[in-house]
Amino acid sequence: MGSLVLTLCALFCLAAYLVSGSPIMNLEQSPLEEDMSLFGDVFSEQDGVDFNTLLQSMKDEFLKTLNLSDIPTQDSAKVDPPEYMLELYNKFATDRTSMPSANIIRSFKNEDLFSQPVSFNGLRKYPLLFNVSIPHHEEVIMAELRLYTLVQRDRMIYDGVDRKITIFEVLESKGDNEGERNMLVLVSGEIYGTNSEWETFDVTDAIRRWQKSGSSTHQLEVHIESKHDEAEDASSGRLEIDTSAQNKHNPLLIVFSDDQSSDKERKEELNEMISHEQLPELDNLGLDSFSSGPGEEALLQMRSNIIYDSTARIRRNAKGNYCKRTPLYIDFKEIGWDSWIIAPPGYEAYECRGVCNYPLAEHLTPTKHAIIQALVHLKNSQKASKACCVPTKLEPISILYLDKGVVTYKFKYEGMAVSECGCR
């Protein structure tokens, strides 16, 4: 598995190097091939590192975390996300103290745009069609069907409209009864409508069953009838379901799921941050004694042997070029990803910049390996490169994006913003 942290760090360092902290350059205006000559200094101390490989690895890790195989190809027309999904994103983006019940939230819209409701003896039927696809490794926490009810009544006479709503699943016919429809009741409830508004129905069990079946296309039917079995009197008011695709009240199927990968991702990120410490250059330096046995004593001995050479370097470090976190704003439009990333338009990712010369400051939390590496480099720069200024603590961001036309919200996309830097 590629190193997400290292590739992100490499990309951020490159962007800052080219634009000096400004938003990412327009890749179309500056082809990668033309700029490769500028990158030599950035990776001069990392033998065998190919920049194109780093960029591709970063892209692959980003898409993998979002369960995408490639950058989604979207229609040129701008997709208007459901108001509910925008409200959801804005709520958790502004209120850091709250969190959703699941890490991933998908909204599936009604695909049946041509069928009309049917009325018979006070019963109104609304056909709905959803294409639902949930990865098998995810756990469905909750699912709900959101319907916008249209209440029509004489406000001078009636306080509200009293109706019973039943949600059916239309099952596939088997055997010789292909012409017959089998209906399964998913949920039923009573509504006293006074104003047009959203109503929510729990369909969690059905979505879990759909996920296991592997089938993506599912048909529902909404029945609305009077509570007292009398024929609906238009003069007493009506309650309907808004199924029009021309507005923002189209029926929605909202699925809350958890990929259960947050803990695993955090552990992998920590491992990735130190994986580059296994440098082949150190294998030939005869430093085995530092990793086993009296490591502290050996470290002190090496320090005393080369401390005389550090005075001038310490003066240079005091000029403020030491390893630290610096601003780096990522603009999704600049890199052409605004066609499928709905929100945010960009974010402050930060980056780690500066040198890790000896002596390594305590606030940079250097590992023993980093200290040894810095000492070896101080003694002979040809044998080992300097310790690297890298992220040691990362924070997630929330993202609202399109996945094959499905508006999807991910509360925690791990490892996207640097919160602390150190020498490794």
Swiss-Prot record:
Highest taxon in the source lineage: Eukaryota
Pfam families to which the protein is assigned, alphabetical: TGF_beta (PF00019), TGFb_propeptide (PF00688)
Summary of the tissues where the protein is detected: Detected in mammary epithelia (at protein level).
Propeptide section residues: 22-316
Alphabetized SUPFAM superfamilies for the sequence: Cystine-knot cytokines
Disulfide bond sites: 323-389, 352-421, 356-423
Major localization class: secreted
SMART domains registered for this protein in UniProt: TGFB
GO molecular function, one term: receptor serine/threonine kinase binding
Keyword Transcription regulation part of the UniProt annotation: no
Span of the signal peptide: 1-21
GO cellular component: cell surface; cytoplasm; extracellular region; extracellular space; Z disc
Sorted UniProt keywords: Cell adhesion, Cleavage on pair of basic residues, Cytokine, Developmental protein, Disease variant, Disulfide bond, Glycoprotein, Growth factor, Secreted, Signal
Annotated disease: Defects in BMP10 may be a cause of congenital heart defects, a wide spectrum of cardiovascular malformations resulting from anomalous development of the heart, cardiac valves, and endo-thoracic large vessels.
Biological role stated in the UniProt entry: Required for maintaining the proliferative activity of embryonic cardiomyocytes by preventing premature activation of the negative cell cycle regulator CDKN1C/p57KIP and maintaining the required expression levels of cardiogenic factors such as MEF2C and NKX2-5. Acts as a ligand for ACVRL1/ALK1, BMPR1A/ALK3 and BMPR1B/ALK6, leading to activation of SMAD1, SMAD5 and SMAD8 transcription factors. Inhibits endothelial cell migration and growth. May reduce cell migration and cell matrix adhesion in breast cancer cell lines.
The protein's name in its UniProt record: Bone morphogenetic protein 10
Gene source species: Homo sapiens
Gene name of this polypeptide: BMP10
